Amino acid sequence: MEAASTWALLLALLLLLLLLSLTLFRTPARGYLPPGPTPLPLLGNLLQLRPGALYSGLLRLSKKYGPVFTVYLGPWRRVVVLVGHDAVREALGGQAEEFSGRGTLATLDKTFDGHGVFFANGERWKQLRKFTLLALRDLGMGKREGEELIQAEVQSLVEAFQKTEGRPFNPSMLLAQATSNVVCSLVFGIRLPYDDKEFQAVIQAASGTLLGISSPWGQAYEMFSWLLQPLPGPHTQLQHHLGTLAAFTIQQVQKHQGRFQTSGPARDVVDAFLLKMAQEKQDPGTEFTEKNLLMTVTYLLFAGTMTIGATIRYALLLLLRYPQVQQRVREELIQELGPGRAPSLSDRVRLPYTDAVLHEAQRLLALVPMGMPHTITRTTCFRGYTLPKGTEVFPLIGSILHDPAVFQNPGEFHPGRFLDEDGRLRKHEAFLPYSLGKRVCLGEGLARAELWLFFTSILQAFSLETPCPPGDLSLKPAISGLFNIPPDFQLRVWPTGDQSR
């Protein structure tokens, strides 16, 4: 009897959803939106957008509907998609304020709930972003102090590589730990040893989160979270990973609170936030709350751990796949720096080919191919269409970095595309791995510095080899969703000048 009642309730619910979907799709609201495939009740555009191939499906639709079109992710989530350099720059650059809202990430929204510098909107976001940028700058980002901080961690990574003594190893964990330590130093004022079990668990949680939100299931969840959320599934493991990150963050914040003094200088981002909280504690409308503190630093920890490490890993993979490129990079480093002097940020101008290789690695990887979701902050006209306030927008950053109108043969690895006739670095306005506009990655300066110093220092210290034939290495992302995640590979490193081989 109870089973029959349950099935009757589910049937009634499905019928209600069907009627609601039909009602929504009959409204004239689509008239002012860009064209797109007709959505089906309950399914939206599932037939055109298969989870696991969401990005490629959107690119395929752009060939039919043009660079600006509308899709439905599930029955109600309506998204305007921007494809190619011209459309994305016109929106995020030309109408930056109107396109500056943060859209939905269903896999993470339950945890962040509109709090923290990344997920906030409106006045909350403006205050948190301004504060975070100033705090990072005051702590040395973009200055000599920040460079020295990164160089110290580089030395620790080089020493860890040396301990492998020519044995094959997967560099993923060490690279993630090294880049995470830079963030931990700035945010929490700590550095953790690579063999620390808690640190390794945090890295594994960050990696699991990245995999979870980019996986085919993660893409399905973005379309049907209303259906999948109450059911058992991989999202429970994702919540476990996020819980591990949050627990580590809470632990570090509580340590700061235990020794916090309002009269002392800020030693890290958490200190700076606590000082701001103390200054505004009498303001009932303040955005400097413990919730925003925890969500801001949790995001910084996650983003700073996985994104930079993944990019360095892909750059090393490319050098294994193309040994002649690695040889040319190493020759440039030896010629300009010699074996003894550590690379610095000021060396970029002296190492144009090395810089071009790093640019091309970022372009080819297209780490965030779908871009981060935006929303329209006020009803606006764009290319003859009227986009209502609250409309979600996907600016496909990967479609810029692989735009054949800008980059000839975009699927090929060709560092020379970033060099001019005189061998100097050529800047491309379509080189936008960090997006653009008001939501441009707030850690862009730090990311660029880390990529340069880690990459050049590794290549100065070691020659790189793969245990397998270079031609057998795949450059295709292991998972392609919100993020393009590079495949795992085995690496062997030999100290420069090693005569024992």
Swiss-Prot record:
GO terms for cellular component: endoplasmic reticulum membrane. The keyword Iron applies. It is found in: Endoplasmic reticulum membrane; Microsome membrane. One of its GO terms (molecular function) is iron ion binding. Its EC number is 1.14.14.-, 4.2.1.152, 5.3.99.5. A cytochrome P450 monooxygenase involved in the metabolism of retinoids and eicosanoids. In epidermis, may contribute to the oxidative metabolism of all-trans-retinoic acid. For this activity, uses molecular oxygen inserting one oxygen atom into a substrate, and reducing the second into a water molecule, with two electrons provided by NADPH via cytochrome P450 reductase (NADPH--hemoprotein reductase). Additionally, displays peroxidase and isomerase activities toward various oxygenated eicosanoids such as prostaglandin H2 (PGH2) and hydroperoxyeicosatetraenoates (HPETEs). This is Cytochrome P450 2S1. The lineage of its organism: Eukaryota, Metazoa, Chordata, Craniata, Vertebrata. The gene is Cyp2s1.
